[in-house]
Regions:
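A contiguous strand-loop segment
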Residues: 1-86, 106-178
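Second-shell loop/turn segments in exported
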Residues: 79, 88-97
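Cysteine-dependent hydrolase recognition
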Residues: 94, 100, 118
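Generic secondary-structure transition motif, activating predominantly at the C-termini of alpha-helices
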Residues: 97-98, 111
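Aromatic- and Gly/Pro-rich donor/ligand-binding loops
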Residues: 103
Length: 178
């Protein structure tokens, strides 16, 4: 993924680009996901989304876009509630997030409450005003960094947040025990 802050682009737009590098001849799709505030849901080990042949990227009515890149982690403390979360994170974020910051808060809540069951992943979220990179490892640990308005960041399927200052809440978020 590539994320450019609004002062790093000619027209002042926040730009998010992502290519899917899965094997085979795959054409990634982007979906406009309507708002959904469901009172309850069913639990599945694997989730299929009705009407979606594949699930690559999402954009909602508030202009919040979310994509993800696999990142291998060495976290060995598997800690899940109700099977943890995995592929459904993008859909849940697209259904509820009103901003990129809100998307990161939702991801953090999901990881802290349920645990992330994949090896690791970086979610990249953007709205018309800002972009964030949110890194997860297996279990309940996550960290996120706001991409500065004058910066372009590339996320090449490995973790790229280097230094974290959780006291700087305008630019960082994460698990309390990071």
């Amino acid at each position: 993924a590539v994320l450019a802050g609004r002062n790093a682009t000619v027209d002042g737009s926040v730009l998010l680009a992502h290519n899917e590098d899965d094997s085979g001849e795959q054409m990634p799709n982007i979906y406009n996901v309507p708002r959904n505030d469901a009172a309850g849901t069913n639990k599945y080990l694997w989730i299929e989304f009705p009407g979606m042949a594949v699930s690559d990227g999402y954009l909602n009515e508030y202009g919040v876009a979310v994509v993800s890149d696999a990142c291998n982690s060495r976290e060995d403390r598997e800690d899940f509630t109700d099977g943890g979360v995995l592929y459904e994170v993008r859909t849940l974020v697209a259904q509820k997030a009103r901003s990129a910051r809100h998307a990161v808060e939702l991801i953090g809540e999901l990881v802290e409450e349920r645990g992330y069951r994949g090896s690791g992943r970086t979610y990249v979220v953007a709205d018309p005003y800002e972009g964030w990179v949110c890194a997860l490892v297996k279990g309940r640990h996550w960290v996120a960094q706001r991409v500065p308005d004058d910066m372009v960041m590339t996320i090449p399927n490995y973790y790229c947040i280097n230094e974290v200052n959780l006291a700087d809440t305008a630019n960082f978020m994460g698990s309390p025990d990071i």
